[in-house]
Amino acid sequence: EPDADPGRDLLSMAIINAALERRIPIFAICRGLQELVVATGGSLHRKLCEQPELLEHREDPELPVEQQYAPSHEVQVEEGGLLSALLPECSNFWVNSLHGQGAKVVSPRLRVEARSPDGLVEAVSVINHPFALGVQWHPEWNSSEYALSRILFEGFITACQHHIAEKQRL
């Protein structure tokens, strides 16, 4: 595949597994979610566009960047997970969608946190980890304008602060 980068993939898997083993907080975005799925034993749809039951999740490169990163579909949050704890008053919200691959099989080590209307996994967390969250969308885009994105980043920052404080106590 033209976009394949085996060296990057190996490095990503090593970093993810080291962070999981050391219980270091992870906030995996877009490809990061896909790498988290694979690192924990899951698999991917290599080309979502070849799955007729799924929505179009790729961006249109002909559009201005602002439109490419604009919200394009809703996600439904699963109850009882990390995402619902971070967003207790929010069971569904709109996200942008700029990916050609997506989770096919999710490892038993992961918990599905959110899905798009077509059933595709849009967010996962690692079970029994203080904060290892992967999202398929790009919350970093215009995050200063979206309270939901800020809440996710603040949750990650808080988890990092707790991790550092815990290490200092040891």
PLM region descriptions:
Residues 33:
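The feature captures the ABC ATPase H-loop/switch
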Residues 37:
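Structured adenosyl-cofactor binding patch, chiefly the S-adenosyl-L-methionine
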Residues 1-27, 40-41, 45, 49-53, ...:
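Flexible gly/pro-rich beta->alpha loop and the following alpha-helix that scaffold active-site loops
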Residues 135-170:
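Acyltransferase
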Residues 109, 127-132:
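Beta-strand-turn-beta hairpins that frame and shape the catalytic cleft
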Residues 30:
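Conserved G/P- and acidic residue-centered "switch" motifs that form tight phosphate/ATP-binding loops
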Residues 3, 41-122, 158-159:
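Pocket-forming structural segment of enzyme catalytic cores
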